[in-house]
Amino acid sequence: MSDSIVHVTDDSFEDEVLKSLEPVLVDYWADWCGPCKMIAPVLDEIAGEYAGRIKVAKLNIDENPNTPRRYGIRGIPTLMLSRQSEVEATK
């Protein structure tokens, strides 16, 4: 995993994502999720290639259930783009 990827929790989400000065791509994932593991190399590549321009963050939904619930995350993997404390897109 890229050193550029930030692991966030329910407690750190506001500081790491919502208060970030750069756009943040959040990957909602779980250890048991096969498709989550499949997109991990792509996220590593994005984190390295766009370091300093976009922050890539990962949030484990099993360990941090409050944030996914707050944003209506119902399935994984889900990617969410946040900019200036606003959710721009979720897929």
UniProtKB/Swiss-Prot annotation:
<dbReference type="InterPro" id="IPR036249">
    <property type="entry name" value="Thioredoxin-like_sf"/>
</dbReference>
<keyword id="KW-0676">Redox-active center</keyword>
<protein>
    <recommendedName>
        <fullName>Thioredoxin</fullName>
    </recommendedName>
</protein>
<feature type="disulfide bond" description="Redox-active">
    <location>
        <begin position="33"/>
        <end position="36"/>
    </location>
</feature>
<dbReference type="GO" id="GO:0015035">
    <property type="term" value="F:protein-disulfide reductase activity"/>
</dbReference>
<dbReference type="GO" id="GO:0045454">
    <property type="term" value="P:cell redox homeostasis"/>
</dbReference>
<comment type="similarity">
    <text>Belongs to the thioredoxin family.</text>
</comment>
<keyword id="KW-0249">Electron transport</keyword>
<dbReference type="InterPro" id="IPR013766">
    <property type="entry name" value="Thioredoxin_domain"/>
</dbReference>
<dbReference type="GO" id="GO:0005829">
    <property type="term" value="C:cytosol"/>
</dbReference>
<feature type="domain" description="Thioredoxin">
    <location>
        <begin position="2"/>
        <end position="91"/>
    </location>
</feature>
<keyword id="KW-1015">Disulfide bond</keyword>
<dbReference type="Pfam" id="PF00085">
    <property type="entry name" value="Thioredoxin"/>
</dbReference>
<dbReference type="InterPro" id="IPR005746">
    <property type="entry name" value="Thioredoxin"/>
</dbReference>
<keyword id="KW-0813">Transport</keyword>
<dbReference type="InterPro" id="IPR017937">
    <property type="entry name" value="Thioredoxin_CS"/>
</dbReference>
<comment type="function">
    <text>Participates in various redox reactions through the reversible oxidation of its active center dithiol to a disulfide and catalyzes dithiol-disulfide exchange reactions.</text>
</comment>
